[in-house]
Amino acid sequence: MPELPEVETTRRGIERHVTGRRVTSVIVREPRLRWPVPGDLAERLTGHTLGRVLRRAKYLLIEVDTGLLLLHLGMSGSLRVVTPDAPLRKHDHIDLCLDSGRCLRLHDPRRFGAVLWIEGPAHAHPLLAELGPEPLGKDFDADYLFRSTRKRRVAIKQHIMNSHVVVGVGNIYASEALFLAGIRPGRAAGRLTRAECARLVETIRQVLGEAIAQGGTTLRDFVREDGSHGYFQQHLRVYGRTGLACMACETPVKQIVQGNRSTYYCPACQR
């Protein structure tokens, strides 16, 4: 599933092709995504100029003078900038054609993504209203994380993956951040000290920043706006390295299951 670094990579990649461009046509080949694509989407967009491309958690928001276009990449979706005559692939569901002669094309094999229209303030939309702070923003700091963990028995990895606590810390990045912080993923969140929370905030920021700089992580489906892959998978320290030597101490990396997801950690470095 595209996580925060992949979505931010997509945002940066498409913004220069989208902002300031007028929509000349909208092609909806498959309206049955996670939620139905609005039937009047073409009417709402055609002839209008697109503004900034924003990101909130894993949602992309494209400004239009009459509202906001919300996009979500689901489990395996991607957005590519193509020419109108670019060969269609199976699961290319929606094109936004622009006056530049380019199209923004949504590819979504599992159809778990979303293309929705927002009128009114974005923060009040049901999909956005209950989200926690951005991990790279000023509201996510040591004091906030420490307060959020008090009296919580849930494992710290599951705690930081809860989008009500903080957004965008997906499975890969949670394992990597906890490794760098030296914190075992199964520890109860409420047992962390303030110093450990401060360290974890910094490693979450570090890992996400590194992943964005590398264009995200491509394990299966994710591609960037030009069809290229992300490269952060080449820099993973523990994720997917079961039985291999820890890069810090050479102890074999362990794999466990938490909340139906694989977790990777070093039993010597993380406590």
UniProtKB/Swiss-Prot annotation:
Cofactor note: Binds 1 zinc ion per subunit.
GO molecular function list: 8-oxo-7,8-dihydroguanine DNA N-glycosylase activity; class I DNA-(apurinic or apyrimidinic site) endonuclease activity; damaged DNA binding; zinc ion binding
Protein name: Formamidopyrimidine-DNA glycosylase
Alphabetical list of Gene3D superfamilies matching this protein: 1.10.8.50, MutM-like, N-terminal
PROSITE patterns: FPG_CAT (PS51068), ZF_FPG_2 (PS51066)
Residues at the catalytic site: 2-3, 58, 261
Function of the protein: Involved in base excision repair of DNA damaged by oxidation or by mutagenic agents. Acts as a DNA glycosylase that recognizes and removes damaged bases. Has a preference for oxidized purines, such as 7,8-dihydro-8-oxoguanine (8-oxoG). Has AP (apurinic/apyrimidinic) lyase activity and introduces nicks in the DNA strand. Cleaves the DNA backbone by beta-delta elimination to generate a single-strand break at the site of the removed base with both 3'- and 5'-phosphates.
Biological processes per GO annotation: base-excision repair
Family per record: Belongs to the FPG family.
Cofactor: Zn(2+)
UniProtKB keywords: DNA damage, DNA repair, DNA-binding, Glycosidase, Hydrolase, Lyase, Metal-binding, Multifunctional enzyme, Zinc, Zinc-finger
Organism: Thioalkalivibrio sulfidiphilus (strain HL-EbGR7)
Highest taxon above the source species: Bacteria
Annotated PANTHER family: FORMAMIDOPYRIMIDINE-DNA GLYCOSYLASE (PTHR22993:SF9)
Ligand binding (DNA): 91, 110, 152
CDD domains xrefs: EcFpg-like_N
Catalytic activity: Hydrolysis of DNA containing ring-opened 7-methylguanine residues, releasing 2,6-diamino-4-hydroxy-5-(N-methyl)formamidopyrimidine; 2'-deoxyribonucleotide-(2'-deoxyribose 5'-phosphate)-2'-deoxyribonucleotide-DNA = a 3'-end 2'-deoxyribonucleotide-(2,3-dehydro-2,3-deoxyribose 5'-phosphate)-DNA + a 5'-end 5'-phospho-2'-deoxyribonucleoside-DNA + H(+)
HAMAP family: Fapy_DNA_glycosyl
